[in-house]
């Protein structure tokens, strides 16, 4: 049976994640409030941040930065955009 959540990012009922994608309280909040589709969108955004900002994931500061951006993306004002980023036309 598919688990459904009221996705905080998409603003609608959608298929939920199969397991918490991140440890701790933040992972539980994401599991309870974020859909698979929104999580997939975050992964793409996170990849863009890592590549454009040249983050080294072995560096604890980079991992903490991504965790704070993930929280902002889902529960705050939104995550950072790389300098000069222009969204694609839809």
From Swiss-Prot:
Molecular function terms, GO-annotated:
iron ion binding
Q: Which InterPro entries match?
A: Fe_traffick_prot_YggX, Fe_traffick_prot_YggX_sf
Q: What is this protein called?
A: Probable Fe(2+)-trafficking protein
Q: Name one GO biological process term.
A: cellular response to oxidative stress
Q: What does the protein in this record do?
A: Could be a mediator in iron transactions between iron acquisition and iron-requiring processes, such as synthesis and/or repair of Fe-S clusters in biosynthetic enzymes.
UniProt keyword Iron, yes or no:
yes
Superkingdom of this protein's organism: Bacteria
Q: Name one Pfam family in it.
A: Iron_traffic
Q: Which GO terms describe its cellular component?
A: cytosol
Q: Member of which family?
A: Belongs to the Fe(2+)-trafficking protein family.
Spans through the membrane: none
Q: Which organism is it from?
A: Nitrosomonas europaea (strain ATCC 19718 / CIP 103999 / KCTC 2705 / NBRC 14298)
Report the SS bond pairs. none
């Amino acid at each position: 049976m598919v688990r459904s959540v009221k996705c905080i990012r998409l603003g609608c009922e959608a298929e939920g994640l199969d397991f918490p994608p991140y440890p701790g309280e933040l992972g539980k909040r994401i599991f309870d409030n974020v859909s698979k589709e929104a999580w997939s969108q975050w992964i793409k955004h996170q990849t863009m941040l890592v590549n454009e900002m040249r983050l080294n994931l072995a560096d604890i500061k980079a991992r903490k930065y991504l965790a704070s951006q993930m929280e902002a993306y889902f529960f705050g004002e939104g995550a950072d955009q790389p300098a000069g980023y222009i969204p694609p036309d839809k």
